[in-house]
Swiss-Prot record:
It comes from the Bacteria. It comes from Burkholderia multivorans (strain ATCC 17616 / 249). F-type ATPases have 2 components, F(1) - the catalytic core - and F(0) - the membrane proton channel. F(1) has five subunits: alpha(3), beta(3), gamma(1), delta(1), epsilon(1). F(0) has three main subunits: a(1), b(2) and c(10-14). The alpha and beta chains form an alternating ring which encloses part of the gamma chain. F(1) is attached to F(0) by a central stalk formed by the gamma and epsilon chains, while a peripheral stalk is formed by the delta and b chains. PANTHER family: ATP SYNTHASE SUBUNIT B (PTHR33445:SF1), ATP SYNTHASE SUBUNIT B', CHLOROPLASTIC (PTHR33445). The chain crosses the membrane at residues 7-29. Keywords: ATP synthesis, Cell inner membrane, Cell membrane, CF(0), Hydrogen ion transport, Ion transport, Membrane, Transmembrane, Transmembrane helix, Transport. GO terms for molecular function: proton-transporting ATP synthase activity, rotational mechanism; proton-transporting ATPase activity, rotational mechanism. This is ATP synthase subunit b. Pfam families: ATP-synt_B.
Length: 156
């Protein structure tokens, strides 16, 4: 094997090239690779964060929809209760009005009965006086008999 100066020169050139590469070329390549891996890691982290935020947003939307449904159902139930209460109130008012009208009609009927009785008492008293007058065939003292008939009327 022949070792000559060319081989040594090539080795020196190779070592200088390796040193130059390690000193000036390799650090930017490593930095570029590190930056790229950092960007990829940041992108993956951002994607995971976005996915988590999306899931959280879906959960919030589902909760808000459920709350809106519950609120709607509650409002419907409240409206039904109010409608039922109004219907009951109207029914109670109608029953009270009917009872009032019936009571008023009964009171008026009682008044009519009392008036009719009073009128009948007066007529009976007048007829009794006429009958007694005709039976006795003499003149009757109107005032004395009127007092007697009023006493009888009061007793009746």
């Amino acid at each position: 094997m022949n070792l000559n100066a060319t081989l040594f020169a090539q080795m020196v050139v190779f070592l200088v090239l390796a040193w130059f590469t390690m000193k000036f070329v390799w650090p930017p390549l490593i930095n570029a690779l590190d930056e790229r891996s950092k960007k990829i890691a940041d992108g993956l982290a951002a994607a995971e964060k976005g996915k988590a935020e999306l899931e959280a947003a879906h959960k919030r939307v589902d909760q808000e929809l459920a709350q809106a449904r519950n609120d709607g159902q509650q409002r419907i139930a409240d409206a039904e209760k109010r409608a039922q209460a109004v219907a009951e109130e109207i029914k109670a008012n109608a029953q009270a009005e009917a009872a009032r009208i019936v009571a008023q009609a009964k009171a008026e009927a009682e008044q009519q009965i009392v008036k009719a009785r009073e009128a009948l008492r007066g007529e009976v008293a007048a007829l009794a006086v006429k009958g007694a007058e005709q039976i006795l065939k003499r003149e009757v003292d109107q005032t004395a008999h009127a007092q007697l008939l009023n006493q009888l009327k009061a007793e009746l």
